[in-house]
């Protein structure tokens, strides 16, 4: 368990106090993949770097298990950091070392015997799929391969927590997907707690269990990804979701003006996503429907679908009740 208790961070710039992170309370459970999303300057990197005290808090407490991280001395902090791995947006690899040498580096720093280092490096390179690149140098690797080296290096000391600071921001979409699949696999197989920061809701949707949304240094929304993604409450969260779904709200409302009838958003979750509910209810109630927007996808391992439809004619009250009875969430956009 990682627990933030009124933790906050301020800087002094030219005699002025700049608040990077307002006091917040947050819990991250053991074995979770927890996402933190926000625009540039929202406080994401500050928050994640408080966990291993690369940033020093201005106040509040941070607990990892029963240990108060904010009270640790230098010796305790070194021990803590061996239990926390970290990967970065720009990889931070040592250019003069081979792939194997980069992965070995944290183990060399703590005096691990060479035979153990060699065995551990071989194991980690197999885990991230880079056995063939062991003797290559970072300049010879693709961006995705460099990040896989970063992941292997972060796992070298057997951490309990993995911090990912914009780990996919420098990668193309296909490589991003493969790196996220690797992180999900590591979470499943090793039981690591993963804390991931990003400015992309699509990254959160693919891999995270829960999410916190930051805006101007404040925690504005948090909860399970399915709930936050499908029913965003704060305006910042709604913007992130619209960007992920490639929805232009202004354009959508112009479409509303061009059609008649009652307009609703239908949300399907789980196996019901693939049931022919809309057609069945239309037949049963005599309601005609016009699909204005639609999407079927997954939130981590859970299928979901969203349709925005215009309903005309028939018994629309019965149709609405039929959707609810079938487990479909109904939101009226225009009655």
From Swiss-Prot:
ATP binds at residues 38-45. Its main location: membrane. It is found in: Cell inner membrane. Residues 2-241 form the ABC transporter domain. It catalyses: L-methionine(out) + ATP + H2O = L-methionine(in) + ADP + phosphate + H(+); D-methionine(out) + ATP + H2O = D-methionine(in) + ADP + phosphate + H(+). One of its GO terms (cellular component) is plasma membrane. Its EC number is 7.4.2.11. It is a peripheral membrane protein. The keyword Endoplasmic reticulum does not apply. GO terms for molecular function: ABC-type D-methionine transporter activity; ATP binding; ATP hydrolysis activity. The keyword Signal does not apply. Keywords: Amino-acid transport, ATP-binding, Cell inner membrane, Cell membrane, Membrane, Nucleotide-binding, Translocase, Transport. CDD domains: ABC_MetN_methionine_transporter. Part of the ABC transporter complex MetNIQ involved in methionine import. Responsible for energy coupling to the transport system. Belongs to the ABC transporter superfamily. Methionine importer (TC 3.A.1.24) family. PANTHER family: AMINO ACID IMPORT ATP-BINDING PROTEIN (PTHR43166), METHIONINE IMPORT ATP-BINDING PROTEIN METN (PTHR43166:SF30). The complex is composed of two ATP-binding proteins (MetN), two transmembrane proteins (MetI) and a solute-binding protein (MetQ). This is Methionine import ATP-binding protein MetN.
